Amino acid sequence: MIGRLHHVILDCPDLEASATFWSEVLGQPITYRSEDFWVVAEDDRHSGLAFQLAPGAVPPTWPDPSVPQQIHLDVMVEDLPEAKRRVALLGARHLDGDVYADPAGHPFCLIPMPSWAT
């Protein structure tokens, strides 16, 4: 092993909106805040999802390829209809099927919990 993954970092124009959204989706607290970087993780000793301030960030236009996605996240859920309802209440934008966009426009998929993950 060369190293261990620290964080997956997403550019976003509004740190609070992105971190709060993902904190609610993942059920994890915001563990770090600075002027230009916030982290959502299990606690401050674990890797997590981080947000880097990028005022000029242009969100992907998926499925239209004119502004391609650089990354997307898959979120395993136990109750797909309930998860869809809850992410919409948090401000997610429905793109197609089980694909949504977070407040900064990053696509993510809601996927039924696979049997190996239970």
Regions found by a protein language model. Name each.
Residues 14-15, 68-107:
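Vicinal oxygen chelate
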Residues 2-4, 65-70:
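Short glycine-enriched loop/turn motifs at secondary-structure junctions
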Residues 41, 62-65:
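Short secondary-structure boundary/capping segments
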Residues 40-44, 100-103, 113:
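Active-site beta-strand termini and strand-to-loop segments that position acidic
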Residues 110-117:
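Short beta->alpha transition motifs characteristic of CBS
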Residues 56-62:
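A short, acidic/glycine-rich surface segment
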Residues 2-3, 9-49, 54, 82-85, ...:
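Core segments of cupin and vicinal oxygen chelate
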